[in-house]
């Protein structure tokens, strides 16, 4: 994986052949390389640092200040593809918190500025530039009162990693409203998970995120 990334002029690989580069997917690779490097004498740390620096300099959306959701390779150059989505931005921020906490905090501040919603429910909007009270998004799922279910879940991980406990608690209240915790024989899970199991797994991962474990 490191070899293929370094062989790419953009330091990015497409998730699917012939499609855009999905930045959250690339960040999975970068986090994996960073984790490996932390245990094996920084073996791939140069690649990780190069990628993060390119992201800071070349892949920032001017309007929101956030790392792009999508990139497109065009001839020998690479360009940002709009829109910058709340779900992708929250996931980008979470992964960055595991690689470069300082940059992640900058991204988190931009996420809060452009996508944070406090009323009627705390969460992350999928779109920063338009209202969507009810709709369906191919990435985020059902949009309700502007909120992105995926973005809101991923933001729990951002808030946990970056120690924003005030907003984290508000997000967990929203998750409870949407998921409805039930307890049976000493075990708890979201009732909604009977229909959306992946959502429960994501929330569990996000609320127990590094650097500290909190339930």
Regions found by a protein language model. Give the residues of each.
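CBM-like carbohydrate-recognition segments
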Residues: 104-215
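Residue-level recognition of well-ordered secondary-structure positions
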Residues: 2, 30-31, 93, 156, ...
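Extended ligand-binding clefts on enzyme/binding-domain cores
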Residues: 8-11, 19-150
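Intrinsically disordered, low-complexity linker/loop segments enriched in Gly/Pro
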Residues: 1-9
